[in-house]
């Protein structure tokens, strides 16, 4: 079976490295970009199955980048990685087409679940983001 292809977007190189280690070898990580504008360009060119992106990035934030990609017909599933626990961010990410909303503090336990859910068109939200433990 072919591995799902993932593109990462985060402006913190050490976090990109950790995310890559978590996702491989189960998934093929195509690479990483550090801002939303670069994400839009790379996603159009590479056509990944899943985008794992930070909410807060320079030039174009993750939410705006996701909206732009969806408006352009991008079919990649979107999983947001974030430090934001504010429900307004969660709602904005879901409205932008996100299927995953993962707390960076729970990345090790939640990210693979979120990607799997996204690939099967299901929503995954880190339990801490919904007030659960």
Q: What annotation goes with each model-predicted range?
A:
Residues 90-95, 99-133:
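Short, flexible helix-to-coil linker/hinge segments that flank and couple to helix-turn-helix
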Residues 57:
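Receiver (REC) domain active-site loop signature in two-component systems and cognate sites
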Residues 13-31:
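Two-component/phosphorelay signaling modules centered on CheY-like receiver
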Residues 54, 82:
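Active-site residues of response regulator receiver
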Residues 46-52:
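Active-site beta3 strand of CheY-like receiver
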Residues 44-46, 68-75, 96:
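Conserved phosphotransfer cores of two-component systems
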Residues 9-10, 33, 51:
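Conserved sequence signature across two-component system core domains
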Residues 35-38, 61-64:
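Acidic catalytic/metal-coordinating carboxylates
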């Amino acid at each position: 079976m072919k591995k799902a292809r993932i593109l990462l977007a985060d402006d913190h190189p050490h976090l990109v490295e950790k995310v890559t280690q978590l996702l491989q070898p189960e998934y093929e990580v195509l690479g990483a970009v550090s801002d939303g504008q670069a994400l839009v360009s790379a996603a159009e060119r590479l056509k990944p199955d899943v985008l794992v992106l930070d909410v807060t990035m320079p030039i174009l934030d993750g939410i705006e980048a996701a909206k732009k990609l969806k408006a352009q017909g991008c079919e990649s599933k979107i999983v947001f990685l974030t430090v934001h626990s504010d429900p307004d961010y969660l709602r904005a990410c879901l409205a932008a087409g996100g299927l995953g909303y993962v707390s960076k503090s729970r990345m090790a336990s939640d990210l693979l679940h979120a990607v799997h859910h996204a690939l099967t068109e299901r929503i995954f939200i880190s339990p801490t983001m919904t007030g659960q433990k």
